Regions:
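Short beta-strand elements at the ligand-binding edges of bilobed clamshell
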Residues: 1-16, 29-32, 37, 134-146
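Short, solvent-exposed amphipathic alpha-helices that sit
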Residues: 6-10, 37-60, 74, 78, ...
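Sec-exported extracytoplasmic/periplasmic mature domains
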Residues: 12-19, 47, 51-55, 80-88, ...
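Nucleotide donor/acceptor-binding cores
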Residues: 18-26
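Conserved acidic residues
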Residues: 24, 91-92, 138
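Short beta-strand/turn micro-motifs composed of small residues
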Residues: 27-30, 121-123
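Hydrophobic alpha-helical
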Residues: 45-46, 61-131
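Hinge/cleft segment of the Venus flytrap/periplasmic-binding protein
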Residues: 144-169
Length: 169
């Protein structure tokens, strides 16, 4: 699964959450430990695809924020502050890792914002799947590790037989 495919998967989820008219505020939230070149590419792929998919009268304001997670509870504090200051809440919140997803889930419940913010989580744990079942989180995106393993083996076999491997695995 590459950044293009991940971006398309996120776009598919976000497209159904856009306001019919007016501007939809979308925030991509990650931590310094999960922020990579790959997450940047996913963000730009979503931005590009949403621009082409939006309908007349729809506007999208896409932003990203990376929480410095070098100290304990930095992520929790940032998410809490965001929910306490309700004016800064986006319409759609896209979580780019499991820690952010679980913090946002807890804040939605703690600050009575369930239904006010649509949330796309990342990964699948019992907590996240339970939140989706309850309708607190809209959806989650997770990588299929079996598929990643198969692609890795294919890339390794190609490298061993040809001396190089393509970048599409």
């Amino acid at each position: 699964l590459n950044s293009y495919e991940m971006g398309s998967a996120y776009t598919d989820q976000i497209a159904g959450m856009l306001n019919e008219k007016g501007t939809t505020q979308i925030l991509f939230l990650s931590t310094s430990s999960s922020k990579t070149q790959e997450t940047n590419l996913v963000y730009y792929q979503v931005k590009k695809e949403l621009e082409s998919r939006k309908k007349t009268g729809q506007s999208v304001n896409l932003s990203e924020y990376c929480v410095d997670s070098s100290a304990d509870f930095d992520t929790e504090e940032f998410v809490r502050d965001m929910f306490v200051n309700e004016e800064s809440l986006p319409d759609v919140l896209v979580c780019m890792d499991e820690v952010v997803t679980e913090c946002v889930y807890q804040a939605l419940v703690d600050y009575n914002q369930v239904g006010n913010v649509k949330v796309i989580g990342y990964y699948y744990s019992d907590v996240i799947l339970n939140a989706i079942d309850k309708g607190i989180l809209s959806s989650t995106i997770a990588m299929d590790m079996d598929e990643v393993g198969k692609y890795s083996v294919n890339a390794l076999e190609e490298y061993l037989s040809l001396g190089h491997s393509n970048g599409y695995y």
